[in-house]
C-alpha cells in the first residue's frame, strides 16, 4: 500500500515504526533509539497514539484536536487559532495576521510583507529580502549579505550558503519531508 512503516534515521539517532487504519491514517507512531535490528523489544519504544472521527484527527498523544465548521483547527499545540474568509488564519495565540483583497498575507504580528508583480514575497519589514529563480526561492539577503539555498533531490532546502561558500545553516528532514533539525554556524550579523 506504499505506506511508510519504519524509518531508521541515523542522523537523528532514532528509529520510528508506524501503524495505520484501513483509510491510511496513522494510528500509532513508536520511537526508539536508532537501530537496524529486525525485532525490537516493545518495552524499548515510546508510543504516540492517534484517534480519528471520520476525516478529523481528534487527538494525538495528550493533545486534543477541535475543528470549526469547515475543518480548520481551533487549537494547535495548545494555542488558539482563529480563521476568517474560509482558510485565512487571522490569529494564532497572541499573533495577528492581516491580508489584502487578493488574499495575500500582509502581516504576521509586527512583520509586514512586500510582494512583487508575480505575487511573491520579496521583502519583510525585519530587513529580510528574498531572491527567486525559475524554481522558486533561491536565497535571501540579510543585513546586506547574500545567502543562497542548497536543495536536495526533493527540492527541500538542505543548507544556507554565504557569499564565501561557507555553510551557515544546515537543515535535516525526516522520511515524511518534515523539517526535523537545524544546525547553525555563525551568521554574519553586521
What are these regions (language model features)?
Residues 1, 65-88:
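Extracellular repeat-rich scaffold modules on cell surfaces
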Residues 34-51, 144-190:
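A motif-centric feature for acidic-aromatic and gly/ser/thr-rich catalytic loops and repeats
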Residues 1-28, 32, 84-108:
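Repeat-solenoid scaffold signature
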Residues 18, 48-50, 64-65, 81, ...:
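A residue-level detector for well-ordered beta-strand positions
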Residues 4-8, 26-29, 43, 60-61, ...:
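Beta-strand-dense domains in secreted/periplasmic systems and polymorphic toxin scaffolds
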Residues 53-58:
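Extracellular, surface-exposed repeat architectures
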Residues 21, 52, 68, 83-86, ...:
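Short, acidic, Ser/Thr-enriched surface-loop or helix-capping motifs
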Residues 3, 23-25, 70-72, 88, ...:
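Generic structural signal for coil-to-beta-strand starts
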Amino acid at each position: 500500500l506504499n505506506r511508510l512503516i519504519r524509518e531508521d534515521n541515523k542522523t537523528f539517532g532514532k528509529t520510528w515504526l508506524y501503524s495505520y487504519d484501513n483509510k491510511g491514517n496513522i494510528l500509532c507512531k513508536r520511537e526508539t533509539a536508532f537501530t537496524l535490528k529486525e525485532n525490537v523489544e516493545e518495552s524499548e519504544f515510546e508510543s504516540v497514539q492517534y484517534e480519528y472521527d471520520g476525516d478529523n484527527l481528534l487527538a494525538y498523544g495528550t493533545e486534543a484536536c477541535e475543528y470549526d465548521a469547515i475543518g480548520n483547527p481551533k487549537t494547535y499545540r495548545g494555542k488558539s487559532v482563529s480563521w476568517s474568509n474560509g482558510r485565512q488564519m487571522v490569529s494564532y495565540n497572541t499573533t495577528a495576521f492581516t491580508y489584502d483583497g487578493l488574499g495575500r498575507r500582509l502581516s504576521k504580528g509586527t512583520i509586514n510583507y512586500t510582494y512583487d508583480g508575480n505575487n511573491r514575497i520579496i521583502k519583510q519589514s525585519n530587513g529580510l529580502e528574498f531572491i527567486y529563480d525559475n524554481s522558486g526561492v533561491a536565497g535571501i539577503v540579510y543585513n546586506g549579505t547574500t545567502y543562497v539555498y542548497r536543495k536536495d533531490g526533493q527540492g527541500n532546502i538542505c543548507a544556507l550558503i554565504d557569499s564565501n561558500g561557507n555553510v551557515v545553516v544546515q537543515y535535516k528532514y525526516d522520511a515524511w519531508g518534515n523539517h526535523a533539525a537545524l544546525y547553525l554556524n555563525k551568521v554574519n550579523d553586521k
